[in-house]
Amino acid sequence: MANTADVIIIGGGIIGNAIAYYLAKKGTDVIVLEGGDHIGNGGSSRNGGGVRQSGRDPRELPLVMYGIKNLWPSLSEELEVDCEYHQDGNLRLGKNDKHKQILEGLTERAVKVGLDVRMIDGDEVRRINPYLSDEVTCASWCPTDGHANPLTTTLGFYKTARKLGVRFITGEKVIELKKIKGRLRQVITPNNIYEADTVVVAAGYESKEILGTVEIDVPMSRVLIEALVTEAEPHMFDQMLGTAEADFYGHQTKHGSFVFGGSSGYEAVNKDNGTPICSSITAPCICRGIMKYFPDLADAKIVRTWAGWADQMKDGVLSLIHISEPTRPRLI
């Protein structure tokens, strides 16, 4: 039947596309349902492109470290697309004692899990990146971090998964998961009913409402983050950059333009009309933060800005759960 598969994946972002690709490599019959008109139109295409291990909760590190070591180095070749992956390190910058305490805590916790990350002083920071302001007094330095292009990477997973037979259906908003004889079997949309032995919910913030239809409560929220891209500039540096208090983050692309992201601090109290819309105050806030760290970028011209939702769990840690109760088998 056209509406049946071994696995149905709900969500067409980079996570859904990647899961579909790796399952299809093993010969699994997969359907991906995406509620929007296009794949990757959420956070997957709106983020700053960081491929990092540093600055994370230690519970995330084993999975992330595996990906950095085993997946990313050969991903462009495997997907036959330029993911623009650069593994040139990550500097998380600080200017004062408070910043240093934050960075030292993150570093100590990561080292205990086995990550190669260390604290460095301002002089060593500027040896790595001579464009940084003299105000920078410390940083955490993870040489195996990097950055990539989230657009081409998502598209690469999508195209390669399609070649392997994955069926992608856009404009199919899932409104309900349904059990038959006590077992989860059906995925309901306004126009169709789909059936599979296994259902993977990877729909970002929308996962909360979808899982609620089978009485699974997900403590999740979303935060509006904005990003900007500049005109192409002469090559300056290759590292991924961030700050202790997350004022901004970003990198220089292979094409010369800079991509930076961040927030103003007012996003939580701004009006939420259901769509990610840029605020008039956020880009100036990001730019002021950048100029304090990179005076040489003061005259860089912004080409465009955009906004996107950052989906996050209550504790800020990604959630990967296999629901194995008798009444809800094969739900991930």
Where are these regions (language model features)?
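Short beta-strand to alpha-helix junction loop
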Residues: 63, 93-102, 141-159, 275-281
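Single conserved hydrophobic/aromatic residue that forms the stacking wall/gate
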Residues: 321-332
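Central helical "cap/lid" subdomain
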Residues: 40, 192-237
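Glycine-rich FAD pyrophosphate-binding loop
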Residues: 24-44
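Dinucleotide-binding Rossmann-like beta1-alpha1 core, especially the glycine-rich loop
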Residues: 48-128, 247-249, 274, 289-290
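Helical element adjacent to the flavin cofactor pocket in flavoenzyme catalytic cores
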Residues: 144-197
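N-terminal Rossmann-like FAD-binding beta1-loop-alpha1 element of flavoenzymes
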Residues: 5-31
